[in-house]
Amino acid sequence: MEFPGGNDNYLTITGPSHPFLSGAETFHTPSLGDEEFEIPPISLDSDPSLAVSDVVAHFDDLADPSSSQDGSFSAQYGVQTLDMPVGMTHGLMEQGGGLLSGGLTMDLDHSIGTQYSANPPVTIDVPMTDMTSGLMGHSQLTTIDQSELSSQLGLSLGGGTILPPAQSPEDRLSTTPSPTNSLHEDGVDDFRRQLPAQKTVVVETGKKQKAPKKRKKKDPNEPQKPVSAYALFFRDTQAAIKGQNPNATFGEVSKIVASMWDSLGEEQKQVYKRKTEAAKKEYLKALAAYKDNQECQATVETVELDPVPQSQTPSPPPVTTADPASPAPASTESPALSPCIVVNSTLSSYVANQAFSGPGGQPNITKLIITKQMLPSSITMSQGGMVTVIPATVVTSRGLQLGQTSTATIQPSQQAQIATRSVLQAAAAAAASMQLPPPRLQPPPLQQMPQPPTQQQVTILQQPPPLQAMQQPPPQKVRINLQQQPPPLQSKIVPPPALKMQATVLPPTVESSPEQPMNSSPEAHTVEATSPETICEMIADVVPEVESPSQMDVELVSGSPVTLSPQPRCVRSGCENPPVISKDWDNEYCSNECVVKHCRDVFLAWVASRNPNSVVLVK
């Protein structure tokens, strides 16, 4: 064969120990008869990137040191014993020689002239007429793609896999008694021997070095594990043995202690075992406390609250009122329900709603727990340890709702809704009472609601029939996306006489149209409390008038807690006297004076809700 670039570039294929291989003889194919075949020249394009030195250098690692100068090429095809000349085109040579390198032991009876590109998949047609006992000898023409070559033969079309060097013809042919019969047997045996090795090479090239595992730094606050009973005995006896034998090594001391432990009585061993058991119990307690502390400092934690018995009356959070344009404050949670402060300052909107899981009324609350050092400036702490979160973009659709557990679930909402209300509504637990002062018409506005004591108890004494407040159109929920800081909460509170209220369950809700003025008194706007099962609301003294049954008395209440009284009281706010039986006021008032004062308060509240900018004086 002749390569371009010079007349001296002839490849001499020799086999010194084989009688058929010599440079001066033509090649004979024993399997096909005595026909003579001329070796066709390989015509290569004048590609500057491909030279004879590159082809030969690629097979240098596959050649045997004892072969001749051009033995690298013969070593490549030495496994095939060169029964037939193999014609390769320029497209096959461009693959870097990785396709048939290192001992593909199939006898190729026809020249492979298929052009190959670097883009997979590539189909290779290999005639296998003479390989009857080979790997795929059942088919005369087998289609092999790139993935099969890579997985079964360990070959790579890109030439990236380095295969082990093939056995030289001298080593293989020297032990062959009959060259005619051993041509195919040697090829099949070599193929089977090299197949596992090639697979191993492919697997090894795909492995990545694993990074060494870094040991976690041990927390100094983590409790230490207790030692065993033998370790306690070792500590006790080591000092005595060292005192007697100061030159004894650690191994000698260990042997002495082991013999002493074996000869120790069972009762004495039980003493050390009891110490170990006690230490284990202390360790488990300390470990549990340590884990609880770690979980408390986690970023997000889902907690399932235990159901509160119906007989108990939990303390409700502070009752607040909000203007329509101002957001309702986020729900507050008592420290008795959670050891950590619950706050969510990253969400742009909240929906305060209580979800009950199952008929048992057991709520599931998802809480974001943040340490006290990370609390933002928008959080104000009350004296009772409660936290009120008022983010800049908090809006609610269902408002502040309080159930049997006096907690509210904070849930994110992409587009929250705010509904204005014309009647003071707030959730409360049953079987409790609370005195709160009614509002005056124009007191100085407060920038933030003062937090009442945490142990307030609220009840409702009377519930009117469901009605639309102020005879206005049906309520509508207005969607608001607050992009800027909303105005601060404003409320108007004055100390008036006390108000007596009763507790009841409200099947309906009293709503009003969102057409109320923005600067109206805050008692006309509050947050609705709803739940899937029950509706507990605190409506401050709602009593229908004789002239207009739709008129309602709305009062903002905030004051000190009062004790529960089983006896009924006068309905008028601030009156502690029991009601007098009379058909004129339905056994609800103690005197005519209370009836007149109560009607005046109701009328003033109604006028204020209708005309918030006007001042009405009733004498």
From Swiss-Prot:
In liver, recruited to target gene promoters following treatment with dexamethasone and cAMP. Binding is decreased in presence of insulin. Keywords: Chromosome, DNA-binding, Methylation, Nucleus, Phosphoprotein, Transcription, Transcription regulation. Its main location: nucleus. Residues 223-291 bind DNA. Residues 183-193 have a biased composition (Basic and acidic residues). GO terms for cellular component: chromatin; chromosome, telomeric region; nucleus; PTW/PP1 phosphatase complex. The modification Asymmetric dimethylarginine is found at R479. The modification Phosphothreonine is found at T176, T313. Transcription factor that modulates cell fate reprogramming from the somatic state to the pluripotent and neuronal fate. In liver, controls the expression of hormone-regulated gluconeogenic genes such as G6PC1 and PCK1. This regulation is independent of the insulin receptor activation. Also acts as a regulatory component of protein phosphatase 1 (PP1) complexes. Component of the PNUTS-PP1 protein phosphatase complex, a PP1 complex that regulates RNA polymerase II transcription pause-release. This is TOX high mobility group box family member 4. It comes from Rattus norvegicus (Rat). The lineage of its organism: Eukaryota, Metazoa, Chordata, Craniata, Vertebrata.
